[in-house]
Amino acid sequence: MKIYRPSDTCFDEMKRRMNRRALPEDSVRDTVNAIIQDVFARGDEALFDYASRFDKVHLDSSSLFVTEAELAEAEAMVEGSVKEAIAVSLANIHYFSDRSRRQDWSGVNAQGVEVAERFLPYDRVGIYIPGGKAPLVSTSIMTGGFAQAAGVREIVAATPCGPDGRVNPALLYALKASGATEIVKIGGAQAIAALALGTESVKPVENRLRCLREPGSERFRHLCDLRRITGAK
């Protein structure tokens, strides 16, 4: 554990970081809300514009999703040790998920009426993997893996691509192993809005990303309150 003391030269800076606002600045909030409304209004066109503006990549309807060829290429590029580590991580997630899952039950109450509960997975959920300095393979496993273990039929992943239109091979491999059925090459607030609201190309998901408290920018953290997205409707 790293310990900081008042006598340390970096103490004031660390104190400033620890005391930062839990909520985003108004300017960030306004920017995110504007992006959400824009995606709602313009759909795919807004996604392509933001990809060009923020990620410096030209996308269109033919390059918006990761293809099977790209997945196959990524699998060939990933080292065996990385594949093994991903498999072990997924096995651990499935082990935990299987034992923590709520179980169906039924019974007869005092009036002789049969009562029961069934717990069914969503048909279609979205997961978001932020971009940044390093590919967040762990995030794809810890979100997609749980949805996969729950039996979700359609797992839609969104993650930003690079200026060349490519996504990190290890991340792609992990997403496929975690059950992703679609991978959208879009990041940021526009990706979350597309998953929640839908566009011409992106079918909306049922579960609006409850696993949002992952690494990400201040704009991304603002999206933890998804009532703003549903309000766009």
Regions found by a protein language model. Name each.
Residues 54, 162-163, 190:
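Positions that flank functional sites
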